[in-house]
Amino acid sequence: VSNLFITEPQLEVAETLDRLIGKGNSQSGKILFQNSGAEANEAAMKLARKYQGLGKHGVVSAYKSFHGRTLATLAATGQPEKHEPFAPLPEGFRHAEWNNLDSFEEAIDQTTGAILVEPIQGEGGVNDAGSDFLQGLRKLCDEKGLLLILDEIQTGLGRTGEWFGFHHAGIKPDIVTVAKGIANGV
């Protein structure tokens, strides 16, 4: 079944996800089901571009990050060695030093529309973002009018001791992407 049709089980899962993201309170958010983490991150970046409008298409993500293997998610991935075989990649992606708010602020320019980070980098070496960093990114996004996208592909659905990794920081991202844990290996 595609996203063109709504089924009862799909609706129940969407309502549950909305409630879990809000730590027990419905966020009245929108849930879009995709086939993979890469598709979820791709959709998140497309949504950010659509929301921000023409000229605010840029995304800042962290070095050592991993966001997928589509061209856009690969461009967001902060591992240059993964870029080389597929160059040229889409434009508008910049990278900043992990856990360094100053580096993220320096990477933002007039074309930036969103920041995309993982609460814990998996492929980059199991690097925890820490509450102060995530809270700082939330504040930075609010000040600059940017969307904060949290890639919870590895960390979502209880894998950090909270339903989502960002819950540890007490922040509310604009977009959350989930995969892996939601399918339970299916």
Name each region found by the language model.
Residues G22-K23, H83-P90, H167-G170:
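Short, conserved catalytic or adaptor-binding loops enriched in Gly and charged residues
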Residues K64-Q121, G125-S131, E143:
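PLP-dependent aminotransferase-class I/II
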Residues E8, G37-A38, Y63-H67, Q154-L157, ...:
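Acidic, glycine-rich active-site loops and adjacent beta-strand->loop/helix elements
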Residues V1-L54:
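Glycine-rich loop-to-alpha-helix module at the N-terminal edge of alpha/beta enzyme cores
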Residues D109, N127-G161:
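Catalytic PLP-binding core of fold-type I/II PLP enzymes
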Residues A43-K46, T70-A75, V126-N127, G158-W163:
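Short acidic, glycine/serine/threonine-rich loops at helix termini
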Residues E162, H168-V186:
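Active-site PLP attachment segment
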